[in-house]
Amino acid sequence: MESITSIEMYVADRNAEWLGVPRLVLMENAGAAVARNVLRKFPTAKRILVVCGTGDNGGDGYVAARHLHAAGRTVRVIALGEPREELARINYQAVTRLWGVEVKAAQLPLELLALQDWFMWAEVIVDAVLGTGIRGVLREPHATAIELMNISPAPKVAVDVPSGLDPDTGEVRDKAVRAALTVTFHKAKRGLLAPGAQRYVGELVVEPIGIPPEAELVVGPGDFAYLNFTRRADSKKGDHGRVLVIGGSLEYSGAPVYVALAALRAGVDLAVIAAPEPAAYAAKAISPDIIAIPLEGPRLSTKHVDKLASLAERFNVVAMGPGLGVEEETQEAVRELFRRLAGKRAMVIDADALKALRGVRASGAVVYTPHAGEFKALTGAEPPQSLSERMAVVREQAAALGGVILLKGRYDVISDGVRVKVNMTGTPAMTVGGTGDVLTGLVAAFLTKTSDPLEAAAVAAFVNGLAGEDAAAELGFHITASDLIERLPRVIRRYAFESIR
């Protein structure tokens, strides 16, 4: 049986909406599925109690109550507080307008105990209290609600996950509803299949609710949930990411600047460029926000490796490649530095550095960001035109390299050798030079906010494309990489903080 973690389910739910399937429709389908299974398993039961929490699980319960009432059952609902989610609130209001459904609020344990006769009255109890929303030790009124449900002789039907059961591990830290039937949605939550969970789960039914398979494949707003954008009140400089950019040469000084500025706009505290002298001095002149450390000479060479390896110890992430050039001494320096840092620092490899690392296997968190030509230089493989074939090739080559590949294109394809994601944001206006450097800076920044390099790369591609779309909507096709950088904070703010739950 296919399974999914709670965060993967959250992501799929949000991304389904991004693809055009409203979450209100998903909630309606979920609640209707619960009601349908209650009627199937307990066809003679007439009196049904639905206990609803304050989140989306409670919203599913309100929908189920409405459908059970429509099927001719006598339904009572206990609301454990005002719904805190808008969709749950809509369905709460809908069920309270039904004359035939009795709804009572019970936010305190004493208020629940006063309704103990309702628990004994029921022939079936629907548990819509927590679902996948459990976090740590049970709080009130949830603990009392679970206890009263378990005391009742009526069989329990759990909505998505029995309340109190960890959806990812199947562990029960305190107490959990002992269900005769669990109706879960889209895919089985991993904890439902864990050894020892069966006595709480009972019969397990997986119901489709309209989430398309693309919701798990396509990058969307839900993927922000993998990144941590929160900040403690007592945060200090450096707590939120330090990125070292190794790039630039006599001929190319702008590329590392784009990387560093994008990383700063994506929320890192410190972005430092280590570049050959001409590029370092140019970077200092371009922006006062950037610290630039000059490396002796016109281009990177092996004589700089010791200094750079030592410098990298002060940073979370190293981004290497933009503007370095392809001279043999530079390519050799890239290979040596890559080997020195492998497994010790997260790395983003882009542009000229990609050409130096063909056949060099990665260890640790490494993200490669090639376009089609660089992909061939890195792997020896030609990326196919067909999206499905391209996905297969990127996954195969990522597995061979031991890192994450973000293959840029009309649709960006991202894989760690096992999982594959596709980013659909972007615009033809982004063919202008420098947008790939902005992407490198975003990947570097997001590697400081998650331990999952695939998701760091996926969200970076998503944000980069949205920034390009925003710039093109305002300016047409005549945009620059600087226009993207300017819009990054607004794009990130639009989606990041909805994911903090």
From Swiss-Prot:
(6S)-NADPHX 2 binds at G323, D437. It comes from the Archaea. Residues 220-495 form the YjeF C-terminal domain. It catalyses: (6S)-NADHX + ADP = AMP + phosphate + NADH + H(+); (6S)-NADPHX + ADP = AMP + phosphate + NADPH + H(+); (6R)-NADHX = (6S)-NADHX; (6R)-NADPHX = (6S)-NADPHX. One of its GO terms (molecular function) is metal ion binding. SUPFAM superfamilies: Ribokinase-like, YjeF N-terminal domain-like. Residues 9-217 form the YjeF N-terminal domain. GO terms for biological process: metabolite repair; nicotinamide nucleotide metabolic process. Binds 1 potassium ion per subunit. Residues 221-501 are annotated as: ADP-dependent (S)-NAD(P)H-hydrate dehydratase. Residues 1-221 are annotated as: NAD(P)H-hydrate epimerase. Residues 56-60, 131-137 are annotated as: NADPHX 1. In the N-terminal section; belongs to the NnrE/AIBP family. In the C-terminal section; belongs to the NnrD/CARKD family. Bifunctional enzyme that catalyzes the epimerization of the S- and R-forms of NAD(P)HX and the dehydration of the S-form of NAD(P)HX at the expense of ADP, which is converted to AMP. This allows the repair of both epimers of NAD(P)HX, a damaged form of NAD(P)H that is a result of enzymatic or heat-dependent hydration. This is Bifunctional NAD(P)H-hydrate repair enzyme Nnr. It comes from Pyrobaculum aerophilum (strain ATCC 51768 / DSM 7523 / JCM 9630 / CIP 104966 / NBRC 100827 / IM2). The lineage of its organism: Archaea, Thermoproteota, Thermoprotei, Thermoproteales, Thermoproteaceae.
